[in-house]
Regions:
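Loop/helix-junction capping segments adjacent to catalytic residues or to phosphate/diphosphate-binding pockets
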Residues: 10-13, 92, 123
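Acetyl-CoA-dependent GNAT
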Residues: 6-81, 86-87, 99-101, 105, ...
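Active-site acidic-Proline motif in GNAT/NAT acetyltransferases
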Residues: 86-92, 120-121
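Conserved G/P- and acidic residue-centered "switch" motifs that form tight phosphate/ATP-binding loops
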Residues: 61, 93, 110
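C-terminal "cap" of GNAT-fold acetyltransferases
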Residues: 112-115, 119-132, 136-158
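Extreme N-terminal starter segment of soluble prokaryotic enzymes
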Residues: 1-3
Length: 158
């Protein structure tokens, strides 16, 4: 059974940092333009309350995945970040549970639209996002990596 919890204090951040590092290693791309060093030091600064959210998924009380919500400067727009599920836990519905919970968090915070970026080579992720109603969109910021796909989902009426 998947359990998804909101992370709101420092004591749970070690697990988040470990998962973020695993995500970055598996992605094997240089994301320094996203200030990942700062993010690893203080994830709650970027993804904390009241505008953001940081979620951990557990299976049998073991951390299995994570996802984050980031507030963007454009009014009513947030960004999905750092969706990651550990290799041994994939195919168990964890990513679905994380995305659903994050969408719910974003709606509760009053966001009208959620955006994300991913890489063309990450087809399972693109299919997951499409399953949850995300569609391709134009770039909302400059990502210098090759093969970037930008997606969005309307959450509330404009």
């Amino acid at each position: 059974m998947v359990r998804v919890e909101k992370i709101e204090d420092e004591k749970d951040l070690d697990e988040v940092r470990i998962l973020f590092k695993e995500y970055l290693e598996e992605l094997n791309e240089n994301l320094c333009f996203q200030h990942t060093d700062e993010e690893l030091v203080s994830p709650l600064k970027k993804y904390g309350q009241p505008h953001g959210s940081l979620l951990l998924a557990y299976i049998n009380d073991k951390p299995a995945g994570c996802i984050a919500l980031q507030h963007l400067k454009e009014e009513g727009v947030c960004e999905m970040k750092r969706l990651y599920v550990r290799l041994g836990y994939r195919g168990k519905g964890i990513a679905d549970a994380l995305v659903e919970k994050l969408l719910s968090e974003a709606k509760q915070k009053g966001y009208k639209k959620m955006v994300l970026d991913t890489l063309e080579r990450l087809q399972p992720a693109i299919k997951l996002y499409a399953k949850h109603g995300f569609v391709n969109t134009s770039a909302y910021y400059h990502n210098p990596l090759p093969g970037v796909v930008y997606m969005e989902k309307m959450l509330l009426p404009k």
